[in-house]
């Protein structure tokens, strides 16, 4: 007969064996798990290294393509804007590099930049319609000019006024606005907070231009309000007064509520202005110049780039 002490020793031995088994088993499982994790980590590092190599290779190809474009740029745009002038408009989200690069190519193409007009945040937010209307409908309107009664929103009204003021009408029967009247309009819009501007003439006057180039940014957040619509309508309202208007945005500008996307989605605007959706890249900058040349030569509007709604990568030859 087993005594109570023997029974206690037996139970203790069983529990000790279980404890030893658990320790040994957990050690084995732990080693196996750690080994598996090490293998997975090694595989992930290998994948990351491979992806970095691919990224570097793609960056090198992009850099080579841009260098190639830079080398050929002079030949591609040679004299395509010869004897013509361009006024550059920029939105608050336009990048300095884009504005400077495209303005430089205008000159390389044989054209001149009469000046740069910067639209303020108050302008693109389009929340000051009454304030702008009071400026537009004041005595600053150049003599003999008439604003369109069909344009009632802030962006369109300003585009109409600045189109009359800053662009040489394609119809030779329409007289150009004089320097003094042009200055009156610009100063009024500047002093009321809608624009700032920079001239490139020795007499400090912003001269009349044959075409307009509107440079904007990229993707806008969904809560951007009327910014994209305002810029698109502004650009479209400029167009009837000159020989061509082109709206150029960065990567993302053809998406959502951004200006290029708005212009392309509206059949009327798309028939009035040309657009480029990759002005942050050398091919897009060259295309902007070729697009202006096409408009100045009496060609049709086009939607160029790689984004949604583009009908061609660049201007067909």
Swiss-Prot record:
One of its GO terms (molecular function) is porin activity. One of its GO terms (biological process) is copper ion homeostasis. Residues 1-28 form the signal peptide. It is found in: Cell outer membrane. Pfam families: MctB. GO terms for cellular component: cell outer membrane; pore complex. InterPro entries: MctB. Keywords: Cell outer membrane, Copper, Ion transport, Membrane, Porin, Signal, Transmembrane, Transport. The keyword Iron does not apply. It comes from the Bacteria. Pore-forming protein, which is involved in efflux of copper across the outer membrane. Essential for copper resistance and maintenance of a low intracellular copper concentration. Belongs to the MctB (TC 1.B.50) family. This is Copper transporter MctB. It comes from Mycobacterium leprae (strain TN). The gene is mctB.
């Amino acid at each position: 007969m087993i005594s109570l002490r023997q029974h206690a020793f037996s139970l203790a031995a069983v529990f000790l064996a279980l404890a030893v088994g658990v320790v040994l088993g957990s050690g084995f499982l732990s080693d196996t798990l750690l080994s598996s994790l090490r293998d997975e980590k090694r595989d992930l590092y290998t994948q990351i290294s491979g992806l970095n190599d691919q990224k570097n290779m793609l960056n090198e190809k992009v850099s080579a393509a841009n260098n190639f474009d830079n080398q050929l740029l002079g030949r591609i745009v040679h004299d395509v804007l010869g004897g013509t002038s361009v006024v550059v408009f920029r939105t608050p989200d336009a990048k300095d590099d884009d504005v400077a690069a495209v303005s430089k190519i205008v000159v390389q193409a044989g054209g001149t930049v009469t000046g740069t007009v910067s639209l303020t945040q108050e302008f693109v937010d389009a929340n000051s319609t009454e304030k702008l209307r009071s400026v537009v409908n004041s005595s600053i309107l150049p003599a003999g000019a008439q604003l369109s009664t069909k344009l009632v929103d802030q962006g369109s009204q300003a585009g109409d006024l600045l189109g009359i003021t800053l662009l040489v009408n394609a119809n030779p029967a329409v007289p150009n606005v004089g320097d003094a009247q042009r200055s009156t309009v610009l100063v009024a819009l500047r002093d009321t907070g809608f624009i700032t501007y920079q001239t490139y003439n020795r007499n400090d006057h912003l001269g009349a231009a044959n075409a307009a180039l509107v440079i904007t940014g990229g993707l806008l957040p969904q809560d951007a309000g009327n910014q994209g619509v305002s810029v698109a309508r502004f650009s479209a309202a400029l167009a009837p007064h000159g020989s061509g208007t082109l709206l150029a945005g960065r990567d993302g500008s053809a998406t959502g509520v951004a200006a290029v996307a708005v212009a392309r989605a509206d059949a009327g605007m798309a028939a009035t202005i040309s657009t480029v959706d990759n002005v942050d890249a050398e091919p897009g900058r060259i295309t902007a110049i070729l697009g202006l040349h096409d408009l100045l030569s009496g060609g049709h509007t086009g939607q160029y780039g790689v984004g949604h709604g583009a009908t061609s990568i660049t201007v067909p030859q």
